[in-house]
Swiss-Prot record:
UniProt subunit comment: Heterotetramer of 2 nubp1 and 2 nubp2 chains.
UniProt-listed Gene3D superfamilies: P-loop containing nucleotide triphosphate hydrolases
Keywords: 4Fe-4S, ATP-binding, Cytoplasm, Iron, Iron-sulfur, Metal-binding, Nucleotide-binding
GO biological process, one term: iron-sulfur cluster assembly
An example Gene Ontology CC term for this record: cytosol
Protein name stated in the entry: Cytosolic Fe-S cluster assembly factor NUBP2 homolog
Coiled coil ranges: none
The encoding gene: nubp2
Family to which this protein belongs: Belongs to the Mrp/NBP35 ATP-binding proteins family. NUBP2/CFD1 subfamily.
Domain of life: Eukaryota
Length: 265
């Protein structure tokens, strides 16, 4: 963990807001612009990262230095760890009580050999359950940058994110900012973005709570197709508005470390 420059949790108070999509695409984007990245999936009961990254058939193995991540590329710029890699069948449910989940999360934090990387993005399940307490407590031992909170524009999602803000404050976990996901719909034919839900909810919440608003991510059918098929969206659609949104998020980050990280291609 001490060899990882930036450690970021991705949280949401509600399921279905696209948190795993944000986590995976943020990791892919950072890798795309030259950083070395790790993506840790701690959603033990509903791991979706392996499918999104096209790694469903892969297995993880242990070395003398710990678990070795599954890499998406030969240059090993993006490594992934998920409970899915440890299950013999992707349809096998994880029926564990809290203590066993907590033990697994501790191993994910302490026993993975990420090597020297620039970013570790940690995708979490929705809510504020045992998993969140465990991963936050373990991560706070290693000076994390903080959490990115994901919401959709609707009031019901924003209400749940307020609880997530209270959770972060109670745990003394810094909040990097809020991302408003599903903010508008990108036409796959003309690329025009149209609001189909209410808008600005995430931005208003950020202003109310004095939290940085990182930006909006629209619904993009092409992104959805790539995630379903495990295809790298950025190589398929290099001029997309989604890529521009992710660049804006990264530009808006306030990193905890005083050392500036420089991407290398």
């Amino acid at each position: 963990m001490d060899k990882i420059k930036h450690k970021i949790l991705v949280l949401s108070g509600k399921g279905g807001v696209g948190k795993s999509t944000v986590s995976s695409q943020l990791a892919l984007y950072l890798s795309h612009i030259g950083y070395k990245v790790g993506l840790l999936d701690v959603d033990l009961c509903g791991p979706s990262i392996p499918k999104m990254m096209g790694l469903e058939s892969k297995d993880v193995h242990k070395s003398t230095k710990g678990w070795v991540p599954v890499y998406t590329d030969e240059s090993q710029k993006l490594g992934v760890i998920s409970i899915q890699f440890l299950l013999g069948d992707k349809d096998t449910p994880v029926i564990w009580r809290g203590p066993k989940k907590n033990s697994m999360i501790k191993q994910f934090i302490d026993d993975v050999n990420w090597g020297e990387i620039d970013f570790l993005i940690i995708d979490t399940p929705p809510g504020t359950s045992d998993e969140h307490i465990s991963v936050t407590e373990e991560l706070l031992k290693h000076n994390p940058d903080g959490a990115i909170l994901v919401t959709t524009p609707q009031a019901v999602s924003i209400s749940d994110v307020k609880k997530e803000i209270s959770f972060c404050n109670a745990m003394k976990l810094p909040i990097i900012g809020i991302i408003e996901n599903m903010s508008g719909y990108v036409c796959p034919h003309c690329s025009e973005c149209t609001n189909i839900f209410s808008s600005e909810g995430g931005k208003l919440l950020a202003e109310q709570c004095n939290i940085k608003f990182l930006g909006k991510l629209p619904i993009d059918p092409n992104l959805s197709i790539c995630s379903e098929r495990g295809i790298n969206y950025f190589t398929e659609y290099p001029n997309s508005s989604t890529l521009a949104s992710l660049k804006s998020f990264v530009d808006n980050f306030n990193f905890k470390s005083s050392t500036t990280t420089t991407a290398t291609n």
